[in-house]
């Protein structure tokens, strides 16, 4: 049921107005489409809107739980410098008055940046706030169009027909838990990082943190300031100590949990703990999307998709912005949005459905040949020097290199690809995340590169369209 798009404006729905949805709305409007954004909350910002509220189930497995969509903890700071985080024509620079001036600012500064972006490009005029999308499905009258059913916070329901739907609902709301034998009988308290806000509940406790990626590292050190002991369970064990924290230890993965409150690690170490914090990531989740099986989620692979964006059988009527994780997220949202907008207008053509499917299947086969698990399908970065993918060879980078991906999309839609300075700054920054120690955000030696970056920023004109 692949749609045939001729060159004209389309009526497009965008679901979710976080960093992906905001730039999607802008790029769709720039391409001449009429756009309506659906946002369940009162404000733009998505992931970056902090709240003290958490799910009613601390590990978020109860299907009937009260769901809170924010996963931000109070102490969160960015793990990339602001200079490489922003959209191409709207630099994320220090605000002149209020805000956090640090290069690795806190979440409030990122939210203010997104709010400034929405204001600058008058995006809020196209948003229906406090409106939850309940169902997206082919229109019964015309299966080349899409029916969107929604409900506002005051209980009023409605539906509308669109030529296309762009899904930007993020992937940091539905927690994923690792399988740990015996965990169901372990007597201590458990929480997923989705529901972590402050360290106070762990005062004087022995805490095990499962996972050592960005949130795991942040939460471990946050809790270490107040807990008796913190033990990190990590797949990437380099040493058993961590930075300047005497009460923090690193262990390999967990072998099993026991009813007596102990946890056994794979190196034989046994720890009696009061609490476990699961920093084990999230699942892609689209409860509103009804595609009759044309799009599925299996072990965190959303597929089949052409270039992480278009389901071949439904393209271009359905598209996804922001599925790949890691990498330069805001820039990726922007360039994917340019591609989707230009495809919908007919300015850029997609291959035939069978060709897109062939390429998707070939991509999945390549990942399988390399031994890359399905859950890393949307991992978009250069694996060289990245311990998450430390077993892969440099020549495998072509499979998942974000630079190649950005360059390919830029060529399709005739826009500027990733700037050399942004790529260089990211490559330096991502190594610091893994190898820079617990104070990497406040130590850097890239002054010369930053001078180059700000010279490039100075060339931008206000409200400049960098796609032209």
Curated annotation (Swiss-Prot):
Keywords: FAD, Flavoprotein, Monooxygenase, NADP, Oxidoreductase. Its cofactor is FAD. One of its GO terms (molecular function) is flavin adenine dinucleotide binding. Its EC number is 1.8.-.-. It comes from the Eukaryota. FAD binds at residues 16-21. Pfam families: FMO-like. InterPro entries: FAD/NAD-bd_sf, Flavin_mOase, Flavin_mOase-like, FMO-like. The keyword DNA repair does not apply. It is an enzyme of class 1 (oxidoreductase). GO terms for biological process: glucosinolate biosynthetic process; response to jasmonic acid; response to salicylic acid. The keyword Transcription does not apply. NADP(+) binds at residues 211-216. Catalyzes the conversion of methylthioalkyl glucosinolates of any chain length into methylsulfinylalkyl glucosinolates. PANTHER family: DIMETHYLANILINE MONOOXYGENASE (PTHR23023). Belongs to the FMO family. This is Flavin-containing monooxygenase FMO GS-OX-like 1. It comes from Arabidopsis thaliana. The lineage of its organism: Eukaryota, Viridiplantae, Streptophyta, Embryophyta, Tracheophyta.
């Amino acid at each position: 049921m692949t749609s045939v798009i001729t060159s004209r404006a389309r009526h497009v729905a965008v679901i979710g107005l976080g960093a992906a949805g905001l730039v999607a709305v802008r790029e769709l409007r720039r391409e001449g489409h009429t756009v309506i954004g659906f946002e369940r909350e009162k404000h733009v910002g998505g992931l970056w809107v902090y709240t003290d509220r958490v799910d009613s189930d601390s590990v978020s497995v109860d299907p009937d739980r009260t769901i809170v969509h924010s996963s931000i903890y109070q102490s969160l700071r960015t793990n990339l410098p602001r200079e490489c985080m922003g959209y191409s024509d709207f630099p994320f620079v220090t605000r002149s008055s209020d805000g956090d001036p640090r290069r690795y600012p806190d979440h409030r500064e990122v939210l203010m940046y997104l709010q400034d972006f929405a204001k600058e490009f008058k995006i809020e005029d196209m948003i229906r706030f406090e409106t939850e999308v309940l169902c997206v499905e082919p229109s019964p009258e015309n299966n080349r169009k899409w029916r969107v059913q929604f409900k506002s916070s005051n209980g009023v329901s409605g539906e509308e027909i669109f030529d296309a739907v762009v899904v930007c609902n993020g992937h940091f709301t539905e927690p994923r838990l690792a399988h740990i034998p015996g965990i169901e009988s372990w007597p201590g308290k458990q929480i997923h990082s989705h529901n972590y806000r402050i360290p106070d509940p762990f005062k004087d406790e022995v805490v095990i943190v499962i996972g050592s990626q960005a949130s795991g590292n942040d939460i471990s050190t946050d809790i270490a300031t107040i807990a008796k002991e913190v033990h990190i369970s990590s797949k990437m064990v380099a040493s058993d100590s961590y930075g300047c924290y005497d009460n923090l230890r690193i262990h390999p993965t967990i072998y099993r949990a026991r009813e007596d409150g102990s946890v056994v690690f794979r190196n034989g170490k046994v720890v009696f703990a009061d609490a476990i914090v699961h920093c084990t990531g999230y699942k892609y989740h689209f409860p509103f999307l009804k595609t009759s099986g044309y799009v599925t989620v299996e072990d965190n692979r959303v597929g089949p998709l052409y270039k992480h964006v278009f389901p071949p059988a439904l393209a271009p009527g359905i598209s996804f912005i922001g599925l790949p994780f890691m990498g330069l997220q805001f820039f990726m949202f922007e360039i994917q949005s340019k591609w989707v907008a230009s495809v919908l207008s007919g300015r850029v053509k997609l291959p035939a459905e069978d060709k897109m499917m062939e390429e998707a299947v070939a991509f999945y086969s390549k990942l399988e040949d390399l031994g890359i698990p399905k859950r890393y399908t949307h991992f978009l970065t250069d694996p060289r020097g990245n311990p998450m993918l430390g077993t892969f060879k440099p020549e495998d980078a072509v499979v998942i290199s974000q630079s190649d991906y950005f360059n390919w999309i830029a060529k399709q839609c005739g826009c500027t690809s990733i700037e050399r300075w942004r790529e260089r700054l990211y490559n330096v920054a991502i190594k610091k995340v893994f190898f820079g120690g617990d104070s990497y955000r406040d130590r850097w030696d890239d002054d010369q590169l930053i001078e180059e970056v700000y010279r490039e920023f100075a060339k931008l004109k206000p409200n400049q369209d960098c796609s032209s």
